[in-house]
From Swiss-Prot:
Domain of life: Bacteria
InterPro entries according to UniProt: Ribosomal_uL18_bac-type, Ribosomal_uL18_bac/euk
Family to which this protein belongs: Belongs to the universal ribosomal protein uL18 family.
Alphabetized GO MF terms: 5S rRNA binding; structural constituent of ribosome
Pfam families: Ribosomal_L18p
UniProt source species: Acidothermus cellulolyticus (strain ATCC 43068 / DSM 8971 / 11B)
Lineage per the UniProt record: Bacteria, Bacillati, Actinomycetota, Actinomycetes, Acidothermales
The protein's name in its UniProt record: Large ribosomal subunit protein uL18
Disulfide bridges in this chain: none
PANTHER family documented for this protein: 39S RIBOSOMAL PROTEIN L18, MITOCHONDRIAL, LARGE RIBOSOMAL SUBUNIT PROTEIN UL18M
SUPFAM superfamilies: Translational machinery components (SSF53137)
Subunit structure: Part of the 50S ribosomal subunit; part of the 5S rRNA/L5/L18/L25 subcomplex. Contacts the 5S and 23S rRNAs.
One GO BP: translation
Length: 128
């Protein structure tokens, strides 16, 4: 499936197209299993969204985002919110019985908010 979708992404030099190509390239190698699901990160200009996905069944096991009502009142910059989202996803993963995950940065650089999510998840007790 990722190979089919990667053909739709043009060979243009836009940042989004380049990120999508990186994401498809990585997704060929990374897949979530029931024992070790995939922690997927999506980043927008203002918010971050995180899901834990079992790719064998195609189910989302847990999710968290900075868009949730409880995060709206959280004081801090976007990186601090991303760290808190990482801690939230770790709490929800533990409640679902998940201790280890495969980190899928979705073509984003491991820097800033993406790294803060990973650090927050580790602080929450999730093994990446």
């Amino acid at each position: 499936m990722p190979q089919l979708l990667s053909r739709r992404v043009g060979r243009g030099s836009t940042r989004t197209a380049a990120r999508m190509r990186r994401h498809f390239r990585v997704r060929k190698k990374i897949s979530g299993t029931p024992e070790r699901p995939r922690l997927v990160v999506h980043r927008s200009a203002r918010h971050v969204f995180v899901q834990i996905v079992d790719d064998t069944r195609g189910h989302t096991l847990a999710s968290a985002s900075s868009f949730e009502p409880e995060m709206r009142s959280f004081a801090g910059d976007k990186t601090a919110k991303a760290r808190r989202v990482g801690q939230l996803i770790a709490e929800r993963a533990k409640a679902a019985g998940i201790t280890t995950v495969v980190f899928d940065r979705a073509g984003y650089r491991y820097h800033g908010r993406v790294a803060a999510i990973a650090d927050g998840a580790r602080e929450g007790g999730l093994v990446l």
